[in-house]
Structures are given as structure tokens and as C-alpha cells.
């Protein structure tokens, strides 16, 4: 037992001496590097701070050339109980790099080279080589700490189908995809469909409205002042949108001049319908509601003075169409616009047509002049 203990002690002493000599060699290497850096630098930067002094109590005093092998070995023996030689070497190197960082100086490449070599010798699970390391050395980074492989073509669009295909376009600046795939995964909305709805409305002034009404009732020379004293309000003519309504309106416009100039002497229209509702008394109270003018009938309001009294007679010219007559009963604004004798009754022109025939028939008991007791000489 004593022999084995003596052999074990001698072996431990030999190992400690060998480790002490190796530590001395490493310390001399670092000291030479620091001395070269301080000698080549023009200004006395913080590098002299790392030069160990004999009186310094730092942990690097054991690496100074003035220190003996016994002191370095004794210091390492004190710390060797906690760290192995490789761990101690790495700890001293990291402490030196940390001092460079505290001083704000650039860390020399020689101090980083051992770390890089140690990382390269480790397992590939902890470090992955850059793909451009061999083909493009100028693109080779110092090291890569990522978990996945680097992109072999960083300027190429990353749009893939999950297999082998990949987009061949260049990426947009500041993005991962090209201009075609930059909106990948973004919701797209349809453009709103614009439907243009046009409504055609025509407005006529008083002159235009009186001209249209003059065309409907007659074109003779005696009808020049028939609607001369109409109201100054414009008439709003609604445009027919359907084709059937337009055709109906055109047919009515084509036959109105003939109906106005025919005189209605036989009491029948061109279609063979018997004219009825020739006289229609409207109430004196007029509504203020406006409605579009019909094309077949007209409402006339006449005020005739006589026997110090005035009476209003409303006349309606009918063509025998029941629908048009029903529609004309709703046109209350027309009798206000067509009141040409409301200002005094000074227009006594010779009128033709069914209106003149009704006024001239003195023998008829249902005549307006017979009921009012007015002589027919006033209108001749």
C-alpha cells in the first residue's frame, strides 16, 4: 500500500510539473502578442492596461516572464481542483477578451482564432458551416450561430411549392419575395363594380312650354295669343324611358295637329270614339302640387266678366281615351299655368275648333253662354 501511494504521489508531481511548463509557454505566447500590439500602436491605447505587472494581484501575474515556474504551478494547483487544464485555458482567454471589451478596444484576431477552431471541431449540431465558405470566400462570415442552414441564394425570391421548385425572380429591396409574391398570404378583395345609372330629364321654359301647347291645340294665325298670358313658371317634361311609351307619345304628337285643326264638326274622333265629358267643372280651390303634362288633353281655366260678377269655367278637351282622361284628372298644376284670362279677359281673338263651336252655339240650352246670360257678340 505504501509503495502504491508513493508511486501515485510521484505521478501527480510529474503531471503538475508538465502542466506548469505548458502554462508558462501559453502565457509567454499571449505576452508576446500583447507586446507586439503595444509596440505597433502609435498611441498608448488601453492595450498597456493588459500588460501584467510584477506587483499586480491579477490572475494574469502567473503568466508574466518574471514569475517562476513554481509560482505558476502553485497557482494552477490551487485552481486545478475546480477546473481542468482546457477549462482553465478557455477561462483565461475569455477574461482577456472581456478586458478588451471593457476598454472599448477591438479584440485581436489572434484571440478569436482559438475559439473559432474549437467551434469548428465541435459537433455539427452546435455549428453549421456556411454554404458559400468554399465557393465564395469573400461572402464567408466569421461564424454562423443560427439553427438552420443559410440561404445559398439570398437575393432570390423565397417563394417555393414546398418541394424542389423555387421562384427565380429577384427579391424586392427589404423583403423576402419578388414583386409577384410579395403579397403572399394577404387577403385580396374584389374591386367594387361601378354601375352607371343615367336619368334623362328635360326642362322647358315658359316660351318653350307655350310653343308646345300651341302645337297641340292649333297652328293657325288666329291662335298666336291663345296662351300669351300664361304663368312664368317652367314646365318639367318627363322623358319616357320605355320604348312602348315613346312610340305611343310619337303617335299622339303626329295626330294632334290634325285633331286640333279638324274642328271636331262631326262630334267624332279619327278612331271612331264618341267625344264625351266635353264640359267638366273643376272646384275653385286649386292644389299646389305639380305634375307632368299629358300629351292628349289640356285643362283650361277661363274667367269671363259679366253682370258685375266673374265666374270660372274649366274646359277639358278629350280624345276619347279613358286612360288619358284618368291621368289628366291628376294634373292640377296645368290649369294654373294655362289661365290666360285671369288678368282681365282682354284677349278676344277668333278661336276655332270645338271651343269656338261650343261658344257660338246660342241655341243650345246646355251652352255656357246660355246659362250665364252672356251674348255671343262678345266673342265675334
UniProtKB/Swiss-Prot annotation:
Principal location listed in the UniProt entry: nucleus
A Pfam family this chain is assigned to: WRC
Keyword entries, A-Z: Activator, Nucleus, Transcription, Transcription regulation
Domain QLQ residue range list: 82-117
InterPro entries per record: Gln-Leu-Gln_QLQ (IPR014978), GRF (IPR031137), WRC_dom (IPR014977)
Span of domain WRC: 151-195
Region (Disordered), start-end ranges: 1-21, 222-270, 284-330
Motif (Bipartite nuclear localization signal): 156-166, 184-191
Biased segments, Polar residues type: 297-320
Gene Ontology biological-process annotations: DNA-templated transcription; leaf development; regulation of DNA-templated transcription
Tissue expr: Strongly expressed in actively growing and developing tissues, such as roots, upper stems, and shoot tips containing the shoot apical meristem (SAM) and flower buds. Also expressed in mature flowers, but weakly expressed in mature stems and leaves.
Claim: Transport is one of the keywords in the record: no
Localization, UniProt: Nucleus
GO cellular component, one term: nucleus
Segments of skewed composition (Low complexity): 228-245, 285-296
Metal-binding in keyword set: no
GO molecular-function term, one example from the UniProt record: ATP binding
Induction pattern: microRNA 396 (miR396a or miR396b) negatively regulates growth-regulating factors (GRF1-4 and GRF7-9).
UniProt comment concerning the protein's domains: The QLQ domain and WRC domain may be involved in protein-protein interaction and DNA-binding, respectively.
Family to which the UniProt record says this protein belongs: Belongs to the GRF family.
Role according to the record: Transcription activator that plays a role in the regulation of cell expansion in leaf and cotyledons tissues. Component of a network formed by miR396, the GRFs and their interacting factors (GIFs) acting in the regulation of meristem function, at least partially through the control of cell proliferation.
Name assigned to this protein: Growth-regulating factor 4
Provenance organism: Arabidopsis thaliana (Mouse-ear cress)
Classification lineage: Eukaryota, Viridiplantae, Streptophyta, Embryophyta, Tracheophyta
Amino acid at each position: 500500500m505504501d509503495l502504491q501511494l508513493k508511486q501515485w504521489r510521484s505521478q501527480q508531481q510529474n503531471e503538475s510539473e508538465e502542466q506548469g511548463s505548458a502554462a508558462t509557454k501559453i502565457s509567454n505566447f499571449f505576452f508576446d502578442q500583447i507586446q507586439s500590439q503595444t509596440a505597433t500602436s502609435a498611441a498608448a491605447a488601453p492595450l498597456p492596461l493588459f500588460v501584467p505587472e510584477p506587483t499586480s494581484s491579477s490572475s494574469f501575474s502567473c503568466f508574466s516572464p518574471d514569475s517562476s515556474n513554481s509560482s505558476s504551478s502553485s497557482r494552477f494547483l490551487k485552481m486545478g481542483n475546480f477546473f481542468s487544464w482546457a477549462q482553465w485555458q478557455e477561462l483565461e482567454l475569455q477574461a482577456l477578451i472581456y478586458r478588451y471589451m471593457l476598454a472599448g478596444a477591438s479584440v485581436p484576431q489572434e484571440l478569436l482564432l482559438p475559439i473559432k477552431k474549437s467551434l469548428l471541431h465541435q459537433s455539427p449540431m452546435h455549428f453549421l458551416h456556411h454554404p458559400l465558405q468554399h465557393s465564395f470566400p469573400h461572402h464567408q462570415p466569421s461564424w454562423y450561430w443560427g439553427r438552420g442552414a443559410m440561404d445559398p441564394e439570398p437575393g432570390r425570391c423565397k417563394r417555393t411549392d414546398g418541394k424542389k421548385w423555387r421562384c427565380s425572380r429577384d427579391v424586392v429591396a427589404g423583403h423576402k419575395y419578388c414583386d409577384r409574391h410579395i403579397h403572399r398570404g394577404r387577403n385580396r378583395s374584389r374591386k367594387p363594380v361601378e354601375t352607371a345609372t343615367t336619368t334623362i330629364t328635360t326642362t322647358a321654359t315658359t316660351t318653350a312650354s307655350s310653343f308646345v301647347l300651341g302645337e297641340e291645340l292649333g297652328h293657325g294665325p288666329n291662335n298666336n295669343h291663345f296662351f300669351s298670358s300664361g304663368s312664368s313658371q317652367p314646365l318639367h317634361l318627363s322623358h319616357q324611358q320605355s320604348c312602348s311609351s315613346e312610340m305611343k307619345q310619337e303617335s299622339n304628337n303626329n295626330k294632334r295637329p290634325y285633331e286640333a285643326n279638324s274642328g271636331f264638326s262631326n262630334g267624332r274622333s279619327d278612331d271612331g270614339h264618341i267625344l264625351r265629358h266635353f264640359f267638366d267643372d273643376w272646384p275653385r280651390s286649386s292644389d299646389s302640387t305639380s305634375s307632368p303634362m299629358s300629351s292628349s288633353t289640356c285643362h283650361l281655366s277661363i274667367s269671363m266678366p259679366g253682370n258685375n260678377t266673374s265666374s270660372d269655367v274649366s274646359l277639358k278637351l278629350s280624345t276619347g281615351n279613358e286612360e288619358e282622361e284618368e291621368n289628366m284628372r291628376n294634373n292640377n298644376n296645368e290649369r294654373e299655368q294655362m289661365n290666360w284670362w285671369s288678368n282681365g279677359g282682354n284677349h278676344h281673338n277668333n278661336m276655332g275648333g270645338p271651343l269656338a263651336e261650343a261658344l257660338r252655339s246660342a241655341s243650345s240650352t246646355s251652352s255656357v253662354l246660355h246659362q250665364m246670360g252672356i251674348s255671343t257678340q262678345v266673342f265675334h
